[in-house]
A protein has these predicted regions:
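Membrane-interface helix-loop junctions and terminal tails of multi-pass membrane proteins
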Residues: 1-177
Length: 177
């Protein structure tokens, strides 16, 4: 992915997340601000920040590895989105008590701003990034090549990964030099 696309994507994630929380707050008012909901803020569970960090690291690692494996397996590529969605649904149920289930720094930051809740914010930046980078490295060591890393292959949109999947190209996309 070109640096400009990555930068724009990151900024858009944070701005979009914040806009979504603020719009929801405008529509739901006191219900979203209620202490029991507190803007859906993501905070470590009662087991603490270490457990929350490990939970976020593990879920991010497994999700990224699953996306890389399915999206780079020709027969499974069309199921990449389903695999990612199913894993995320399972994570919401199983992992939420430990970290609140984020896997996305923009999601956590966007809720933290109106809630003014910053406890453990660092781990929601460090753990998902570390887990996904580690998954990428494990994939490269295990399979050697990455052809594509996107969730949805069957569309006519520009591919920011330049993988050539939409053109039938079989050249690998290199994740790490």
């Amino acid at each position: 992915m070109p640096a400009w696309d990555a930068c724009f994507y990151t900024v858009a994630q944070f701005l979009g997340g914040l806009a979504g929380v603020l719009l929801t707050a405008a529509l739901l008012g006191p219900w979203l601000a209620d202490p029991s909901v507190n803007y859906a803020v993501t905070v470590p569970g009662p087991d603490g920040q270490t457990v929350a960090f490990l939970a976020e690291l593990l879920t991010s690692f497994v999700l990224m590895l699953a996306v890389l494996i399915t999206s780079n397996t020709h027969r499974a590529a069309r199921f990449t989105g389903l695999v990612a969605g199913a894993l995320t649904a399972i994570y919401v149920i199983v992992e939420s008590p430990y970290s609140g289930m984020s896997m996305n720094p923009a999601r956590t930051f966007s809720s933290a701003v109106p809630a003014q809740m910053w406890r453990g914010l660092w781990l929601y930046f460090a753990a998902p990034l570390s887990g996904m980078v580690l998954a990428g490295e494990v994939y490269l060591l295990s399979f050697g090549r990455v052809y594509c890393g996107k969730l949805h292959h069957e569309n006519d949109k520009r591919c920011i990964f330049h993988c050539g999947h939409d053109k039938g190209r079989e050249e690998p996309l290199v994740l790490a030099a």
